[in-house]
Swiss-Prot record:
Acts as a transcriptional activator. Acts by binding to sequences related to the consensus octamer motif 5'-ATGCAAAT-3' in the regulatory regions of its target genes. May play a role in specifying terminally differentiated neuronal phenotypes. Residues 81-108 are annotated as: Disordered. Its main location: nucleus. This is POU domain, class 4, transcription factor 3. It comes from Danio rerio. It comes from the Eukaryota. It is found in: Nucleus; Cytoplasm. Belongs to the POU transcription factor family. Class-4 subfamily.
Length: 331
């Protein structure tokens, strides 16, 4: 009789939740069920109540997310007087020994019901209740990941700040007035040692092929060396002059004489000195003819073993000297 009632109960209510079945097994001790003559009636009432509760749980889970703590709270609120309440409730095979004989005929149906409930829960999106230990592990991993992320961000900001501070320090060193003054003095001394004028430096800057930098005037180089340029112009001109100075010193050490680094023009010719015998011969020719022709100048230069241009310049200078002497004698 009792077995038939149980079978009718399971067939009428296929959506019974496994936790309700386990709760009923734990909360009702086996001796009371075996010794009670109304056990079939009691079990039928309990089955109907459990079926309503299971239907309510399933219908509620379709519209709301499944909350494990609510189910655990409901189960813990039921007063359990059996000493075997420590047995896991959710496991269908963990039945008490006293219940084995009573529920032996329900094992096949119970497995089918569990499969049906599991499939219905998976369709509704709830699935099996998550394990609290798994949830705790996932939450812990999430917090660790967020912690590493925040730590990386916190480490990134000081790094950015340190790079910014490093660039600021470099700019401060370059814009230091004392550093600019020391470089200007050093540049002046080394330029003089190389034998290059300020005008030569200004014109040679165009040969460096630096983008945006052309030749500069002699006054600009002079004002740089005397620190009379504006502070911003001093900062802008310093790397250009430093690049020129490095190349000029390298060329000076190698002694290969790069003319474009200095002026690009010919060096000043040395003053020609004429020996006394050649000088007396030129004076004699000048007394005869102060304005010789080009052919006569070439013949004199060949005779005295001098350059034609030297002879021509000497005659020109001698005429200018005679004019000055006549002018001073009249006045």
């Amino acid at each position: 009789m009792m077995t038939m009632n149980g079978k009718q109960h399971f067939s009428m209510h296929p959506a019974l939740h496994p936790s309700s079945e386990g709760m009923r097994r734990v909360c009702l001790p086996a001796p009371q069920l075996q010794g009670n003559i109304f056990s079939g009636f009691d079990e039928s009432l309990l089955a109907r109540a459990e079926a309503l509760a299971a239907a309510d749980i399933v219908s509620h889970g379709k519209s709301h997310p499944f909350k494990t703590d609510v189910t655990y709270h409901t189960m813990s609120s039921v007063p359990c007087t059996s000493s075997s309440s420590t047995v896991p409730i959710s496991h269908p095979s963990s039945n008490l020994p006293s219940h084995h004989h009573h529920h032996l005929s329900h094992q096949t149906l119970e497995g089918d019901l569990l499969d049906h409930i599991s499939s219905s829960l998976s369709v509704s999106g709830m699935g099996a209740p998550p394990d609290p230990s798994v949830m705790t592990t996932q939450a812990h991993q999430h917090h660790l990941q967020m912690g590493h992320l925040h730590q990386a961000m916190a480490m990134g900001h000081p790094h950015t700040l340190s790079v910014h501070n490093g660039m600021a320090c470099v700019n401060d060193v370059e814009s230091d007035p004392r550093e600019l003054e020391a470089f200007a003095e050093r540049f002046k001394q080394r330029r003089i040692k190389l034998g290059v004028t300020q005008a030569d430096v200004g014109s040679a800057l165009a040969n460096l092929k630096i983008p945006g930098v052309g030749s500069l005037s002699q006054s600009t180089i002079c004002r740089f060396e005397s620190l009379t340029l504006s502070h911003n112009n001093m900062i802008a001109l310093k790397p250009v002059l430093q690049a020129w100075l490095e190349e000029a010193e390298a060329a000076y050490r190698e002694k290969n004489g790069k003319p474009d680094l200095f002026n690009g023009n010919e060096r000043k010719r040395k003053r020609t000195s004429i020996a006394a015998p050649e000088k007396r011969s030129l004076e004699a020719y000048f007394a005869i003819q102060p304005r010789p022709s080009s052919e006569k100048i070439a013949a004199i230069a060949e005779k005295l073993d001098l350059k034609k241009n030297v002879v021509r310049v000497w005659f020109c200078n001698q005429r200018q000297k005679q004019k000055r002497m006549k002018y001073s004698a009249v006045h």
